[in-house]
Amino acid sequence: FVGANVGAQMYIGDHISEGKAGKLITPTFEINVGKWFTPVIGLRAGFGGYQAKGYSVKDAGFAYKRVDTNLYRTKWGILHLHGDVMLNFTNLFCGYREDRLYNAIPYVSIGYLRGIDNNENELSGGVGFINRFRLNKAWDLNLELKGNINNDVMDGIRGGKNMEGSAAIMVGATYRFNRRDWTK
């Protein structure tokens, strides 16, 4: 299968509580390819990107705007390449049915983050949940929730926390190639 998603994400980094969290929400996109090996287990590789925003208490990292005496807004670009192990809970607990309207698919993820505006390279780990709605034999509509964690320095600021991360909600579509069902 191949798919594409768009949505909104928020980077959760140092000093997030110092400013308005709503100012940190930015657009995100993702394209992916994958294969279901059984009706329950599948693998997916994805590539996406977004402009992350955050806050800093000093003019450091990717500060671009002073919002208070000791508070700056920051922004930087991130590319994310990841692999996911997916488990179709609906097929696992309710049995396989090709024409099922809805499937619940949680996954675990490992990935690589590359800073566009810096030379930061970080590994990431994550979890997600795909709400898959069947449109027809070939197409699905997806509502996906995901979260990732990574090392403290991805935002260019070492703030004393061990981890930072991001959370996203996306909507997208998946096209399933021929051989769309499983024989029993």
Where do the protein language model's features map onto the residues?
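Short glycine/proline- and aromatic-enriched beta-strand/turn motifs that initiate or cap beta-hairpins
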Residues: 1-34
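Residues on the lipid-exposed face of transmembrane beta-strands in outer-membrane beta-barrel proteins
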Residues: 4-8, 31-35, 83-89, 108-112, ...
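Sequence/structural signature of outer-membrane beta-barrel proteins
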Residues: 9-16, 52-54, 92-94, 111-117, ...
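Outer-membrane beta-barrel proteins
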Residues: 17-21, 33, 69-73, 96, ...
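Residues that define the transmembrane beta-barrel architecture of outer-membrane proteins
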Residues: 21-29, 77-81, 102, 119-125, ...
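Gram-negative (and chloroplast) outer-membrane scaffold detector with strong preference
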Residues: 39-123, 135
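Predominantly the C-terminal beta-signal and adjacent terminal strand-loop region
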Residues: 43-44, 48, 52-63, 71, ...
